[in-house]
Amino acid sequence: MTMDSNTFEIKNCLCCWYDLLGYGAPFVNSKWDLHNGQCKENFERIEQLRLLFTTSLAVKPLGTRLTFNDGFASTIDVDPITPETFYETLLFLEGALHDFESINVEDQRRNFPGARGVITFGQRFSYDHCNSSYDLLSERTVSYHPAEFQMNTAFSKAFIMEESGSRAGIAGSHLYIDIDVYHHIARAANQIGCKIPTIKVEDDVLVLEIFGPKGWFATLQFDSAPIIYGENSNYKNRGIETTLYKYKYMHSVIDDLANEAAYQQSLRYSMMEEESDSE
């Protein structure tokens, strides 16, 4: 029996998966006994990152996050392509990059190795629109199945690629972005009449300029050397064939607005202090 995909609602989406590095070693060394003192380090580590795991810039305004163990995924639907949803997609991407940077800064400040992540593009199909199941007799939730992560191929691909690690050239506490993310942004920008993203290479740095409905949105920098992910004897690609780029830096219009807001706030405090001193 064959199924016609047109009878199902399949949505395009972006998804990121971030995973703490070195988190499994204490569990392995303790034989997976949480009472073992070696696990205390992991408890303290995840507790310090708790707020960064459970709150996110990427989930505003419309993204959704799924957190478990030492990793989390954030996803957003990118259909239908309109100026509004395109801008929300850019906000999600900008927030996801800042989320990754925040986790790495905080984790490495405490001499931990940080996180590794992948952002990719895919589709999702929700087979159950109820996010959880509640048993009235026992008065408890008996299952969780968030619609946004049901059959989410972007989530699956990000998880698989990140898990491949250094065997696939995805090494260290870095973030890697699938070229399919760029392809979607370029396609969507063209469809709604925005300026197409521009790419140039300066020395060993690939510079990507992204534009939104109101003009320039962000400048992203990557290592110019591509990472070809596909069939390879060193790892199982699970049918994924794409190209990744290692993220280095971002400057966005949101950064400028935040800096301006901080500057204005500092001026207010300064003026208040001057008025207080003059009284």
Regions found by a protein language model. Name each.
Residues 1-5, 12, 165-279:
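Intrinsically disordered, glycine/charged-rich C-terminal tails and inter-domain linkers
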Residues 17, 114-120, 170-178:
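A structural signal for short, well-ordered beta-strand segments and their strand-loop junctions
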Residues 23, 124, 181-183:
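Short, solvent-exposed loop/turn segments at secondary-structure junctions
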